[in-house]
Amino acid sequence: MISVNDFRTGLTIEVDGGIWRVVDFQHVKPGKGAAFVRSKLRNLRTGAIQEKTFRAGEKVAKAQIETKTMQYLYANGDQHVFMDTSSYEQLELSETQIKDELKYLLENMSVQIVMYGAETLGVELPNTVELEVVETEPGIKGDTTSGGSKPAKTETGLIVNVPFFVNQGDKLVINTSDGSYVSRA
């Protein structure tokens, strides 16, 4: 058990029969009444976000989450195959389980698979990934003064806004948390 006063971003807890990750939290001490903790939690099974308020000092169960380093091998229909890098066991995840992460996954990429006992909860991507631009409009000379951007399609199908100097075939560093352009690789 862990006190809600010890909440921190990224902590995984069990509440109301679900497994939740703390996305955001705030300790509130009103002038009148008891203190409480307002939190934003993400359900690791469904991906849904819920706001929940706890009384200060309330105890919740800490979920025993394990992460395994695995390599993304290939897609087989709507199943995606990952291999454990230490035991070489293969794991298949459905497209619905990793829908949001698919636009960043490349073959042979190392990722963290989040496990709760024998249940697979999802995929944790690295903070940034390198993707190649397969389609974008050519940059026009002199466009850099406005500081604007144009859409570019990457090899995984992700559409990202990039500066005008980016061309087809360039490798880009993309932030996986929000899908934004970071730099050229």
Swiss-Prot record:
Protein keywords = Cytoplasm, Elongation factor, Protein biosynthesis
First-listed, main subcellular location of the protein, grouped into a coarse class: cytoplasm
Task: Show the taxonomic lineage.
Answer: Bacteria, Bacillati, Bacillota, Bacilli, Bacillales
Keyword Cytoplasm on entry: yes
What pathway is this protein a component of? Protein biosynthesis; polypeptide chain elongation
UniProt source species? Bacillus pumilus (strain SAFR-032)
Query: Which GO molecular-function terms appear in the entry?
Result: translation elongation factor activity
Top-rank taxon, per record: Bacteria
Can you list the GO cellular component terms from the UniProt entry? cytoplasm
* Classification via InterPro entries: Elong-fact-P_C, NA-bd_OB-fold, Rib_uL2_dom2, Transl_elong_fac_P/YeiP, Transl_elong_KOW-like, Transl_elong_P/YeiP_cen, Transl_elong_P/YeiP_CS, Transl_elongation_fac_P
Query: What name does the UniProt record give this protein?
Result: Elongation factor P
The entry's localization annotation reads: Cytoplasm
Which Gene3D superfamilies does this UniProt record tie to the protein?
Answer: 2.30.30.30, Nucleic acid-binding proteins (2.40.50.140)
Leader sequence residues: none
By its UniProt entry, which CDD domains does this protein fall under?
Answer: S1_EF-P_repeat_1 (cd04470), S1_EF-P_repeat_2 (cd05794)
**One Pfam assignment:** EFP
In UniProt terms, what function does this protein have?
Involved in peptide bond synthesis. Stimulates efficient translation and peptide-bond synthesis on native or reconstituted 70S ribosomes in vitro. Probably functions indirectly by altering the affinity of the ribosome for aminoacyl-tRNA, thus increasing their reactivity as acceptors for peptidyl transferase.
Q: Hey, which family's this protein in?
A: Belongs to the elongation factor P family.
